[in-house]
Amino acid sequence: MQVKDQLSLLQPYKPGKSPEQMKEVYGDHSFVKLASNENSFGCSPRVLDELQKSWLDHALYPDGGATTLRQTIANKLHVQMEQVLCGSGLDEVIQIISRAVLKAGDNIVTAGATFPQYRHHAIIEGCEVKEVALNNGVYDLDEISSVVDNNTKIVWICNPNNPTGTYVNDRKLTQFIEGISENTLIVIDEAYYEYVTAKDFPETLPLLEKHKNILVLRTFSKAYGLASFRVGYAVGHEELIEKLNVVRLPFNVSSLAQKAATIAFGDDEFIEEIVRVNTEGLRQYESFCKENEIPFYQSQTNFIFLPVENGGEIYEACAHAGFIIRPFPNGVRITVGTREQNEGVISVLQQHFENKKRKSRDEANV
């Protein structure tokens, strides 16, 4: 069967292993999943309460336009409903954007170490992918600007960045946007927006009034704790959103997902508490790393990245202790959990790095 030639360059997305899959390899004991940046504390209790009380006619299609959810988002963000596009997670929103905008001969520009779906969908559409190395874990907007050309249709900026957790500040982002042609779409993926505590983090929505070529992406999968419902959204200029809706599949967000997201979006107290406990969890890891001279990136998300060698060894050590983290060629990414879970992972890290120091000393004395 003939398919696009470029599909041979790609692999299906491989999520982190589930606890059930881990048991097959590491034995039948409990596992804590800290690999995919889900909310370790779950979702708003209001969501669970309201869904139990609600009745949905499961024989009927959902509202194809997600009208109530989009209006709820628009009201809170002070934009028009027509500026909001909802998708089955940001994965689908990224696919919609790529399918609507890109064609063979175009290129996209993004970072070399960032969310891989930007690259994935560009290749599917037959586009060149220009990847710029991070600068100390942060998007290098100066370098990105220098490689943008007349064929660049999309610049993808993950802010805060996944997997490093770092961010581009307001001044740098605004300066970058001012220097990019309005013919190039700038997509700012703010999946971890709710976790941010930095004072100079950009407020991007006001930029939409001046720049028609900006799209801001956010999700209910992270801080809102609704990853299994698959709801993400884009906010942009009304004319652009209208065109993207042509590509969007009909009935792409289920009735249950729309209702859960609408309820969750109204519980500000829950988000405030989540940010508080998440910040405490980050401080646990940061304190440990500083005390033991272990490199880490200052995070504005619900995970921390340690740029260290032998990430696979750390993954194995954590797995044998019942913790699932995400290894990378140049480090490990660890989702913030409960205080007790963080302490458990830190204990494994402590033992791992002590063993490495001991081994280095022994080799030096040989």
Swiss-Prot record:
The keyword Transferase applies. One of its GO terms (molecular function) is histidinol-phosphate transaminase activity. The keyword Amino-acid biosynthesis applies. Signal peptide: none annotated. It comes from the Bacteria. The modification N6-(pyridoxal phosphate)lysine is found at K222. Residues 1-21 are annotated as: Disordered. It is an enzyme of class 2 (transferase). It catalyses: L-histidinol phosphate + 2-oxoglutarate = 3-(imidazol-4-yl)-2-oxopropyl phosphate + L-glutamate. Its cofactor is pyridoxal 5'-phosphate. Pathway: Amino-acid biosynthesis; L-histidine biosynthesis; L-histidine from 5-phospho-alpha-D-ribose 1-diphosphate: step 7/9. HAMAP family: HisC_aminotrans_2 (MF_01023). This is Histidinol-phosphate aminotransferase 2. It comes from Bacillus cereus (strain ZK / E33L).
